[in-house]
Design a protein with these regions (language model features):
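A generic local secondary-structure boundary/capping motif
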Residues: 1, 9-12, 47-50, 82, ...
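Glycine-rich anion-binding loops of enzyme active sites
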Residues: 14-30, 36, 55-150
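Alpha-helical scaffold segments that flank or form the walls of functional sites
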Residues: 35-52
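Short, solvent-exposed amphipathic alpha-helical segments in soluble enzyme
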Residues: 36-40, 123-125, 146-149, 194-202, ...
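Glycine-/charge-enriched secondary-structure boundary and capping motifs
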Residues: 69-91, 100-103, 175-252
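Glycine- and other small-residue-rich loops at beta-strand/loop junctions that grip anionic moieties
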Residues: 96, 122, 133, 158-162, ...
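Active-site glycine-rich loop that binds ribose-phosphate moieties when present
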Residues: 108-118, 152-175
């Protein structure tokens, strides 16, 4: 793997049969519950290995802790992360903790993949079909959480999706021979990640807005203007490469 694309992780081949996938990801809390935060952060970090076609096997905790944070809260975060690692069949073998002004948590993850089965986030070909394995809208809903704008059902839905491993989706991808590009939709949004998929070929991606699966309340909140700041940056990034067809509806 080289430096010419924005792949989800780095890959290093160690033998004709084995390549190592290495990735790291951590962030500040997006939910109040420490255990759930640990689960979400761990699922997010593990996801990059699945997106590359691999299986996570080893991880290290990365934890930033304010001095005011209780031991019970810290334990909850770590136990949440550990629960997702166990579910993934991945061993957390230690980690590193520092004092910081704001709590942050995530994992450095090592996974393995056969060199012939590495998936990249570039290389989409004409005729490919885009498959989404989770509904969209987590960024909008987590922004709404800060203002207490979510119904209990919408809150539970976004919590469940964010804490769900992409393991089953990763396993399904491995059963399909002709997967030309794969990624997990995270910080750059659907449009940003879709644009990346077009970078190693003269292809365009056509999205039908009404066919996209959305989380409960996502559209309603977007129409209210509950938009994370990152969405506007993503919009600016893809705008030169984006064409809205006649009849397409733009919410923001």
């Amino acid at each position: 793997m080289g430096y010419d694309s924005s792949d989800d992780a780095c890959v290093y081949q160690v033998s004709p049969e084995v390549a190592v996938i290495q990735t790291v990801d951590f962030f500040t809390p997006i939910v109040d519950d420490p255990y759930l935060f640990g689960q979400i952060a761990a699922a997010n970090a593990l996801s990059d290995v699945y997106a590359m076609g691999g299986v996570p096997k080893l991880a290290m905790n990365l934890l930033c802790v304010p001095s005011c944070l209780s031991l019970q809260t810290v334990r909850g975060i770590l136990e949440g992360g550990h629960s997702k690692a166990v579910e993934a069949g991945c061993v957390i073998a230690g980690g590193h903790t520092i004092q910081d002004n704001e709590p942050k948590y995530g994992l450095c993850v090592t996974g393995f993949v056969h060199p012939d089965r590495i998936l990249r986030n570039v290389g989409a070909l004409p005729g490919d079909v885009l498959v989404l394995t989770k509904p969209l809208g987590a960024g909008i809903l987590t922004t709404a959480l800060k203002g207490d704008l979510l119904s209990p059902a919408a809150r539970d839905e976004v919590y469940a999706h964010m804490a769900t491993l992409n393991a089953k989706a990763g396993q399904a991808v491995l059963q399909v021979e002709q997967v030309h590009a794969c990624t997990d939709v995270t910080g750059f949004g659907l449009l940003g990640h879709a644009f990346e998929m077009t970078q190693e070929g003269s292809v365009t991606i056509r999205l039908h807005g009404r066919a996209l699966p959305l989380m409960r309340q996502a559209r309603e909140l977007a129409e209210m203007g509950v938009i994370p700041s990152g969405a506007y940056r993503n919009q600016d990034y893809v705008r030169p490469h984006l064409t809205l067809l006649p009849g397409a509806e733009q919410v923001f």
